[in-house]
Regions:
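Conserved catalytic network of the ASCE P-loop NTPase/AAA+ motor domain
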Residues: 8, 52-55, 65-70, 91-95, ...
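Conserved G1/Walker A P-loop phosphate-binding module
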Residues: 2-49
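Structural beta-sheet core signal
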Residues: 17, 101, 138-140
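Conserved nucleotide-binding/hydrolysis micro-motifs of P-loop NTPases
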Residues: 22, 82, 106-108, 142-146, ...
Length: 192
């Protein structure tokens, strides 16, 4: 749920990077943060548990236009890697405007990808959200690895709704801004 700041004429939109452990969520966010204009981003905050961390920062892209006279500012979050921290994962989804699902392309990670997808559906349903009505691009990360599944196989198992999807090698920045750009534009369109 977007928050409106009338003083600054901004709409704060929340995008959450969700997916399997070690699938590239944090790497995506760190890459965006490292490349974003310092004047257009807030401070990155890391909330650490004993074995996990959740990252957050806000980001004001330059070229997405306005929504009814307001600039769109995006609060970008990651969720903890493991379903063990489901309470935190669920809490981070509260008030979400868009979700970027980060899938690990490695064949041996497919079961974990599917588990993370089911966990996402369950947590959204607990808030009364329907994923078919939320901007929801998918990034297939680690495309450079020799054991990466074909795009056709990934899509058949992880993208039955045919949402916009992107190939990525987040550690090199490939696909990072394409995925975020698509998700951000989808959120702005949903608000217009």
């Amino acid at each position: 749920m977007s928050l409106i700041n009338y003083a600054s004429r901004e709409i704060n939109c929340k995008i959450v990077y969700y997916g399997t452990g070690l699938g590239g969520k944090t790497t995506n966010l760190e890459y965006v943060y490292s490349k974003a204009n310092p004047d257009a981003k807030g401070k990155m905050i890391s909330l650490a548990t004993e074995t996990e961390r959740t990252l957050f920062f806000d980001f004001l892209p330059i070229d997405l236009g306005e929504v009814k006279g307001f600039k769109a500012r995006f609060d970008l979050y990651t969720v903890p890697d493991h379903v063990y921290y489901n309470t935190s994962r669920k809490l981070i989804l509260k008030g979400v405007d868009g979700v970027i699902f980060g899938a690990d392309s490695q064949a041996e990670r497919m079961e974990a990808n599917i588990e993370a997808m089911h966990n996402l559906y369950e947590n959204l349903e607990s808030y009364g959200y329907d994923l078919t009505n939320i901007p929801f691009p998918t990034q297939y990360n680690k495309r450079d690895l020799p054991n990466a599944m074909s795009m056709a196989d990934l899509r058949s198992q992880l993208n039955p709704m045919g949402v916009p999807d992107f190939e990525g090698v987040a550690i090199e920045g490939q696909g990072v801004f394409e995925t975020l750009g698509a998700g951000s534009k989808m959120v702005v369109q949903a608000l217009s």
